Amino acid sequence: MSTEKRIEATAKNIEGKLQEVIGEVTGNPSDKAEGKAKQAESQVIHTTENIKDELKKAID
């Protein structure tokens, strides 16, 4: 498990949520979309790390 990657992904998720809310409040669809994209990227990173963890368990 790469703790550093998970921390980065969590930070990106928080950043994305904030950006999405700012886009919603200001009526800026670009910010809202970018925020959602960052959240999706965060999920991909977390899923990748989960798969790596499971593969390591299976090999050991």
Curated annotation (Swiss-Prot):
It holds the Pfam family CsbD. Disulfide bonds: none annotated. It comes from the Bacteria. InterPro entries: CsbD (IPR008462), YjbJ_sf (IPR036629). This is UPF0337 protein asr4653. Belongs to the UPF0337 (CsbD) family. Gene3D superfamilies: YjbJ.
